[in-house]
Swiss-Prot record:
Interacts with FtsZ. The keyword Cell cycle applies. Is rapidly cleaved and degraded by the Lon protease once DNA damage is repaired. The lineage of its organism: Bacteria, Pseudomonadati, Pseudomonadota, Gammaproteobacteria, Enterobacterales. Keywords: Cell cycle, Cell division, DNA damage, Septation, SOS response. It comes from the Bacteria. The record marks H168 as: Essential for degradation by Lon protease. Belongs to the SulA family. Induction: By DNA damage, as part of the SOS response. Component of the SOS system and an inhibitor of cell division. Accumulation of SulA causes rapid cessation of cell division and the appearance of long, non-septate filaments. In the presence of GTP, binds a polymerization-competent form of FtsZ in a 1:1 ratio, thus inhibiting FtsZ polymerization and therefore preventing it from participating in the assembly of the Z ring. This mechanism prevents the premature segregation of damaged DNA to daughter cells during cell division. It comes from Erwinia pyrifoliae (strain DSM 12163 / CIP 106111 / Ep16/96). Gene3D superfamilies: P-loop containing nucleotide triphosphate hydrolases. This is Cell division inhibitor SulA.
């Protein structure tokens, strides 16, 4: 994951963000969604993801980032308006898959959102297990996938495909 930030696109920590409240039913029912992003245009991903993460940051629960590469920057988190005291990052660990880590984290109910960066498609069985875990923990699970890892014919289930080239 890259933690680049768009120039002149910072959010003051105590500034009110005018994003609509997340319906309680989303967290109560649990939800798994997938965001396919273009790593060459991290600003677009941030524009879509940050309002959601800022809203979830108002909850008493943690946000868990299961990343495979870079460490989250404290400065980036501050500029993004995300609560430092509620964001946890766990880098990829070879003993457990990211999907298994997401399932375990979602089940605990300790996290409002669990973001997992996955390189490969997941099976329908894994998706069902993730959905059940999200429902059990009343949490949101976000599968983050780079579009270079997605086959042209593959489409994310319950997700959003970002065609960054259309916006630039």
């Amino acid at each position: 994951m890259r933690t680049h930030f768009m120039k002149n696109q910072s959010v003051k920590r105590n500034q009110h963000v005018s994003t609509p409240a997340i319906p309680a039913s989303i967290c109560a029912d649990g939800l798994i969604s997938e965001l396919v992003h273009n790593e060459d245009h991290p600003g677009m991903t941030q524009l879509l993801l940050l309002p959601l993460l800022q809203q979830l940051g108002t909850q008493s629960r943690w946000q868990l980032w299961l990343t495979s590469q870079q460490k989250l920057s404290r400065d980036w988190l501050l500029r993004s308006g995300l609560p430092l005291d509620k964001v946890m990052q766990s880098p990829y660990c070879g003993t457990i898959t990211t999907v298994e880590a997401m399932i375990k984290a979602l089940q605990t109910g300790n996290y409002s959102v669990v973001l997992g960066w996955l390189a490969d498609e997941i099976s329908e069985t894994e998706r069902k297990r993730l959905q059940q875990a999200a429902k059990s923990g009343q949490a949101l699970g976000l599968i983050m996938r780079s579009e270079c890892n997605v086959l042209p014919s593959a489409r994310p289930l319950h997700g959003l495909r970002i065609q960054s080239s259309l916006y630039h």
